């Protein structure tokens, strides 16, 4: 079951991608998703098959979503920037001398 897929990147969120069947284009993408995603920017086209490996997505889930809902939304990886790092002197403040 090979699928020719168009992948679009989000102009609003770095590393967020939208996979759609090339033949369908964006017509099956829900209207409510586009304000969140932004105006899709075409990144590239790709032939997807169960044997193909994807860097950050499960190919079986992508193909299932394409068949059932007409699109797959790849969310960006978790951002670790929200973790605050304490200065070394604060980390050692309660250490025994």
Curated annotation (Swiss-Prot):
Domain YcgL: 3-87
Gene3D superfamilies, alphabetized: YcgL domain
Pfam families given in the database record: YcgL (PF05166)
Disulfide pattern: none
InterPro entries assigned: YcgL-like_sf (IPR038068), YcgL_dom (IPR027354)
Coiled coil feature spans: none
Protein name, as recorded: YcgL domain-containing protein PSEEN4034
Species, as recorded: Pseudomonas entomophila (strain L48)
């Amino acid at each position: 079951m090979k699928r020719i897929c168009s992948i679009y990147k989000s102009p609003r969120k770095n590393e967020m991608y939208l996979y759609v069947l090339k033949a369908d284009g964006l017509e099956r993408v829900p209207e409510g998703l586009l304000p969140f995603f932004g105006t899709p920017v075409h990144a590239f086209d790709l032939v997807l098959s169960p044997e193909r490996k994807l860097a950050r997505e499960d190919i079986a889930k992508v193909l299932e979503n394409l068949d059932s809902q007409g699109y797959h939304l790849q969310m960006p990886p978790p951002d670790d920037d929200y973790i605050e790092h304490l200065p070394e002197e604060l980390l050692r403040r309660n250490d025994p001398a």
